[in-house]
């Protein structure tokens, strides 16, 4: 029987420079669930081609809040790209919500979007279409292959850092400069 390392929920998964898969290259994912069956996360630094206004309109939700309508929706990953995932810091009871950890929540129900459209939503929020998933042992294998770094989740990285800066900023929080890393080793 293998022992699962410390679960990675509420950790940021930071792609190392050698990770060349275009979906995950230079990505940062918030790990939302992690257990012996696998892991689920949402990429938090990949813009999609959609604005929140377009998504709300497709769902029949109206809002006059122009900054909300212009908010970029993230591409959260290749799994369930038709589903919405809302990462936020609002502990209210939503229809389908999970506490990722330390005041960070993942909600997948329509009620949070309706509250946002009405001006009653979370103060800090990321909306994504799709998520990332890893089968049993897959993420642990990828970590062992040096594809990823992990760092504690950080509200500043999630909600206050520009999308294009999240990759380097997340790594910098643990003292790593990703531009100084190489993907090969030398021998003496």
Swiss-Prot record:
Q: Which domain of life does this protein belong to?
A: Bacteria
Q: Which InterPro entries match?
A: AlgH-like
Gene Ontology, cellular component aspect: cytosol
Q: Which Pfam families match?
A: DUF179
**Sequence similarity:** Belongs to the UPF0301 (AlgH) family.
Protein name, as recorded: UPF0301 protein XOO1425
Query: Which organism was this protein described from?
Result: Xanthomonas oryzae pv. oryzae (strain KACC10331 / KXO85)
């Amino acid at each position: 029987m293998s022992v699962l390392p410390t679960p990675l929920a509420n950790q940021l998964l930071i792609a190392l420079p050698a990770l060349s898969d275009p979906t995950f290259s230079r990505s940062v994912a918030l790990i939302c669930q992690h257990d012996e069956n696998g892991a689920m996360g949402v990429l938090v630094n990949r813009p999609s081609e959609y604005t929140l206004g377009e998504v709300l309109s497709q769902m029949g939700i109206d809002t006059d809040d122009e900054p909300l309508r212009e908010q970029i929706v993230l591409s959260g990953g290749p799994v369930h790209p038709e589903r919405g995932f809302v990462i936020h810091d609002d502990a209210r009871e939503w229809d389908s919500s999970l506490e990722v950890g330390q005041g960070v929540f993942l909600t997948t129900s329509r009620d949070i979007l309706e509250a946002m459209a009405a001006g009653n939503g979370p103060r800090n929020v990321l909306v994504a279409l799709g998520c990332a998933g890893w089968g049993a042992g897959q993420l642990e294998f990828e970590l062992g292959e040096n594809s990823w770094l992990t760092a504690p989740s950080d509200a500043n990285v999630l909600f206050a850092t520009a999308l294009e800066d999240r990759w380097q900023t997340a790594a910098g929080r643990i003292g790593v400069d990703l531009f100084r890393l190489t993907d090969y080793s030398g021998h003496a």
